[in-house]
Amino acid sequence: MIVTNYIPNAVKNLKLTSAFRGYNPGILDCIETSIDGRIIVVDDVEGTHISTNVEDLHRCCMCVNPNNNEIIVLPLDKRLIKERKGGMADGAVFDEQKFVFLEFKDHALGNSDTAIADTYTKASSQLSSALQLFIEKLATNSICVDFLSSVNVSCHIIVSDKFPRASALEQNMRLLFSMENNGVELSFEKEIMFNSRTGRYDK
């Protein structure tokens, strides 16, 4: 469901409509919301969005939402953000307490150590670019929101179940990413838990 006349609390708290005023389409024309207990999020030609197709499970990000909070799905690359030097993360999922940037590499094959490293390096760069954009936008004088203090921010690289995992490389990349990005966590987990209770129905 695309929301156009209601601003979710998670969006209001971060003043995202003001921070990205003038963007076309705007925040409210991009987002989807759901209070389902399990939310399948994918990225394809339509951008990052909610899917109801169980065939997408092998390549999706699964948001687990036991308290039925209002979860926001925001497509970024080529949707809200048309172009940015350094690239852009595919999208984000968030509620009032947690904000997660997503970069999908679900079509990557990872058929060599070099290919795996290249996939992860490009994805982490795109996530870092998105993170810095939000930090900068929300820190402007007219917004005055400390993004990293307002919500629990993390970044996730999503690969398909067939992609070969490299635990040592992933650990090194986690450490490097955290050092270069104000302590923000980089994760390779496809499942994201939203378990805080929020006043999702407040307007």
Where are these regions (language model features)?
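Short acidic, S/G/P-rich loop/turn micro-motifs used as interaction or catalytic elements
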Residues: 79-83, 107-110, 162-166
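Short, conserved catalytic or adaptor-binding loops enriched in Gly and charged residues
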Residues: 63-64, 147-148, 177-181
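Catalytic cores of nucleic-acid endonucleases
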Residues: 114-158
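Basic, amphipathic N-terminal segments that precede the first structured/catalytic domain
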Residues: 1-84
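Catalytic micro-motifs at enzyme active sites that drive phosphoryl/nucleotidyl and oxygen chemistry
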Residues: 77-83, 88-90, 140-145
